[in-house]
Amino acid sequence: MALQRQLLKRATSDIYHRRAISLLRTDFSTSPSIADAPPHIPPFVHQPRPYKGPSADEVLQKRKKFLGPSLFHYYQKPLNIVEGKMQYLYDESGRRYLDAFAGIVTVSCGHCHPDILNAITEQSKLLQHATTIYLHHAIGDFAEALAAKMPGNLKVVYFVNSGSEANELAMMMARLYTGSLEMISLRNAYHGGSSNTIGLTALNTWKYPLPQGEIHHVVNPDPYRGVFGSDGSLYAKDVHDHIEYGTSGKVAGFIAETIQGVGGAVELAPGYLKSVYEIVRNAGGVCIADEVQTGFGRTGSHYWGFQTQDVVPDIVTMAKGIGNGLPLGAVVTTPEIASVLASKILFNTFGGNPVCSAGGLAVLNVIDKEKRQEHCAEVGSHLIQRLKDVQKRHDIIGDVRGRGLMVGIELVSDRKDKTPAKAETSVLFEQLRELGILVGKGGLHGNVFRIKPPMCFTKDDADFLVDALDYSISRL
């Protein structure tokens, strides 16, 4: 967090901007953009309501006065978002922006999607809250629909409120089921910021100096920056060796994202999980798939990210896109593993809340009805190919990677050494905002643009984004 705030603060300096621009002119080969004029946001039929609330400055002052100091904001001049519709957001002046980050990969179906709004509203009129000490059909209906999306014997659902909670529960299940404490995760991973999941996370910008015992981090199977390139078998051998030399020989579990989100849209090397799952199970552990960002058809090729590696986990965690913005998460596992929790009381006050359950079920229905997985595959392929074409013209683009609408653009100051272009990324980040495009940033050095929009994002939106990036790089 401290590093991110420092980078954002530095980006506000005119000197810093001039240095970044100078670096680009000196070190990079850039070709002129195809466009002579800045591209325009695609047309969209929606009239935002007149805004009569507090200004951005007033909101910022309240944040500083009443909210925790760990919070940070994007952009030199913070953006005051007051309305959203599908893949677009509106500021206090009524200006429209293309949301290419989906509230940090959370708004899956689109802002204020009518079907989801209707489900939430109708349930709210009847019953807003009742815990699982009573019966209510909404939680059962949602659990049944979610279990139907899972392969194998993954049929028992626990509802929580966030990804951190989901991963916390998954880790507890793994430890109770196996009788071991030792967990394995990947370097560059993000699995949450709670007191336990912060141990699974392996990015120093997110880690406080707290006890994190019995958690091991193995070499990240990163095809772009990893020591073994795209050879999944060599990365898997590191897991085997780590279990042999760095643990008791028996582990509780292994957890991984199929495409690392906060880490910069890093897709794991092909075949990696298939080999690692076998190694971990032979060591007595269970395999956990973190689908908080990759799930629900976002990758296009598959409904779940783990399916891209041809594996079936023992536990699956999910959040973010499951609720389209509602505070909702889930853990899905087998009846055998779930049974270890029956000896005590496990209770979550808001887990399975009727309103969240109704909204979550509506999300599943919208994804199916509107064929969003197929849409992600089609639009994502178009987006990635266009980005790769732009990469050929600009040396600053070191890597374009991802699947469907989960895409990363890594910026480097030297393609051979892959030096993170931190300063230049900050400049382009601001320029894209000025052109009306909101993207995310990720990776340890903050030099990866994270393109993960709502799944209603269109080819026209993709063209606008790519043209804006091309235009911005060409004019630095």
From Swiss-Prot:
SUPFAM superfamilies the UniProt entry points to: PLP-dependent transferases (SSF53383)
Listed InterPro entries: Aminotrans_3 (IPR005814), Aminotrans_3_PPA_site (IPR049704), PyrdxlP-dep_Trfase (IPR015424), PyrdxlP-dep_Trfase_major (IPR015421), PyrdxlP-dep_Trfase_small (IPR015422)
Main location as per UniProt: mitochondrion
Class of this enzyme: transferase
Entry superkingdom: Eukaryota
Sample GO molecular function, one term: zinc ion binding
Disulfide bonding pattern of the chain: none
Subcellular location: Mitochondrion
N6-(pyridoxal phosphate)lysine modified-residue sites: 320
Transit sequence range: 1-12
A Gene Ontology term for the protein's cellular component: plant-type vacuole
Cofactor(s) needed: pyridoxal 5'-phosphate
Keywords per UniProt: Aminotransferase, Mitochondrion, Photorespiration, Pyridoxal phosphate, Transferase, Transit peptide
Pfam families recorded: Aminotran_3
Family annotation (CDD domains): OAT_like
Catalytic activity: glyoxylate + L-alanine = glycine + pyruvate
EC number: 2.6.1.44
GO biological process per UniProt: photorespiration
Signal sequence coordinates: none
Similarity remark: Belongs to the class-III pyridoxal-phosphate-dependent aminotransferase family.
Oligomer status and interactors: Homotetramer.
Name of the protein described by the UniProt record: Alanine--glyoxylate aminotransferase 2 homolog 1, mitochondrial
